[in-house]
Amino acid sequence: MSLQRLLQHSSNGNLADFCAGPAYSSYSTLTGSLTMDDNRRIQMLADTVATLPRGRKQLALTRSSSLSDFSWSQRKLVTVEKQDNETFGFEIQSYRPQNQNACSSEMFTLICKIQEDSPAHCAGLQAGDVLANINGVSTEGFTYKQVVDLIRSSGNLLTIETLNGTMILKRTELEAKLQVLKQTLKQKWVEYRSLQLQEHRLLHGDAANCPSLENMDLDELSLFGPLPGPGPALVDRNRLSSESSCKSWLSSMTMDSEDGYQTCVSEDSSRGAFSRQTSTDDECFIPKEGDDFLRRSSSRRNRSISNTSSGSMSPLWEGNLSSMFGTLPRKSRKGSVRKQLLKFIPGLHRAVEEEESRF
């Protein structure tokens, strides 16, 4: 420990002797002034950035594509002089980039037209040059009216610092084409959605219960899959049409035919469940057990319904039809002419009734 303290004291003594010398005094004076200036500049920059709003801070720190970013090699200084009775001979146009921030005040003013044999044409100005500086005043962020007032106040002598605006003109043309393409895409998309809605209505009828395709955005319409099958309304219409056709087919059968009343109705004693099948000739109700039904129906075909004196059907068939068709009205069926004539012949009326009742 004593050796370390001795070395420390010796180094401190040498440093004190150096600081007491004239060389250190001149060096400290020079570096001290520089350090104070740097600290003052850093403090001023920090105070300036701290007083800006948050949006302005990001804009001041991340600003790009500004007129001040161009190097001096890309700049051109032009002096235009005119007489009292003539003009400079150029037209300007202000342009704001479309991809800039909303809080950005960046705006370019460029020369859009040059008259031949004018002072501007003789001075070397070209169409597309960007006006970066006019008479020592930077035009960055100036509006069209401010630039015009600045040119008019310059008198007959105009000193313009220009930049090559070829890239800006190309970007302007591309952005104009982009806007046209966006408008065309919007129109075509509206037509596509209208056609898709018409197709949906043609397949499903009334599209009131379906989600409207016009209220969907691009993402929902891109996820719109294939159209579903027939809705419940179509199934109900098929069911009603089949019932009405079956009803008309049953009502067309009368007791006038000698073959009797033929039908494809079979009763299932265990379940009583029926299923519907549609064929090209007629519609009939068959039970779910197809094989048993075919065996039973083969023995029950061509069955005649006996007509009683009151002209109504037998209780068995009447009960079956009432249980199947529910509220369908029953049509009274008249007997054949031969049976009505046999009733007036004595001795034959009872025999005919007994013979038909055995069936």
UniProtKB/Swiss-Prot annotation:
Disulfide bonds: none annotated. It holds the Pfam family PDZ. By its binding to cytohesin-1 (CYTH1), it modifies activation of ARFs by CYTH1 and its precise function may be to sequester CYTH1 in the cytoplasm. GO terms for biological process: regulation of cell adhesion. Interacts with CYTH1 and SNX27. It is found in: Cytoplasm; Early endosome. One of its GO terms (cellular component) is cell cortex. Changing P329S: Found in a renal cell carcinoma case; somatic mutation. SUPFAM superfamilies: PDZ domain-like. This is Cytohesin-interacting protein. Keywords: Coiled coil, Cytoplasm, Endosome. Changing F90A: No membrane-association. No change in the binding to CYTH1. Its main location: cytoplasm. Residues 166-188 form a coiled coil. Residues 77-166 form the PDZ domain. Expressed in lymph nodes, thymus, spleen, lung, peripheral blood leukocytes and bone marrow. Residues 166-188 are annotated as: Interaction with CYTH1. Induction: By TNF and bacterial lipopolysaccharides (LPS). InterPro entries: Intracell_Traff_Signaling_Reg (IPR052122), PDZ (IPR001478), PDZ_sf (IPR036034).
